[in-house]
UniProtKB/Swiss-Prot annotation:
Protein name as catalogued: Probable glutathione S-transferase
Source organism, top-level taxon: Eukaryota
Biological processes per GO annotation: defense response; glutathione metabolic process
Family per similarity comment: Belongs to the GST superfamily. HSP26 family.
Encoding gene (name): PRP1
Residue span(s) of domain GST N-terminal: 2-81
Species, as recorded: Solanum tuberosum
Length: 217
């Protein structure tokens, strides 16, 4: 039987993407929790270039970067496909995955920065949400009729954005401003709950990093 290990963090959206894909494929794996303040020799050895999680170790071979790992899992293991079969649809899925990956940083900066940097990040986040809201006007998934590669990569905009909003009191996505995006997010979280980490645990984790907005100011 193939040996599969995943170096990651339980509350990281990047690790979560990989766990989700492994569960879709029905792959048994060992999860090794990392401490990013005290990185293990295994992590440093497995990802000597970036020294970041997640890292998938499959039969002693190391694969880094969550989007690269997702494609590897789809090709290396049997089970339901994560990427579409049609070449055009595959290209489309990769396009949207790259878009949300590139633009998603602004969402995180909206909660983890201050002052002018935070305001600029919010504007960039609103622009991304506007584009996604338009994209989900007539569909529930990025490509086709089932959640797949691009949707998994968009977990930061779906699941984790809601967590950050609840913890911080800063709300970026409202149904008044972005009704289609919010409908997609609701469906996303309902349909894929079995693949998600504990919401309560995520709230506890992120409350340790984010101070809520003081509404009295």
């Amino acid at each position: 039987m193939a040996e599969v290990k995943l170096l990651g963090l339980r509350y990281s959206p990047f690790s979560h993407r990989v766990e989700w894909a492994l569960k879709i494929k029905g792959v048994k794996y060992e999860f090794i929790e990392e401490d990013l303040q005290n990185k293990s020799p295994l992590l440093l050895q497995s990802n000597p270039i970036h020294k970041k999680i997640p890292v998938l170790i499959h039969n002693g071979k190391c694969i880094c970067e969550s989007m690269v790992i997702l494609e590897y899992i789809d090709e290396a293991f049997e089970g339901p496909s994560i990427l579409p079969k049609d070449p055009y649809d595959r290209a489309l899925a990769r396009f949207w995955a790259k878009y949300v990956e590139d633009k998603g940083a602004a969402v995180w900066k909206s909660f983890f920065s201050k002052g002018e940097e935070q305001e600029k990040a919010k504007e960039e986040a609103y622009e991304m949400l506007k584009i996604l809201d338009n994209e989900f006007k007539d569909k529930k998934c990025f490509v086709g009729d089932k959640f797949g590669f691009a949707d998994i990569v968009a977990n930061g905009a779906a699941l984790y954005l809601g967590i950050l909003e609840e913890v911080s009191g800063i709300v970026l996505a409202t149904s008044e401003k972005f009704p289609n995006f919010c409908a997609w997010r609701d469906e996303y979280c309902t349909q894929n709950e079995e693949y998600f980490p504990s919401r309560d645990e995520l709230l506890i984790r992120y409350r340790a990093y984010i101070q809520p907005v003081d509404a009295s100011k």
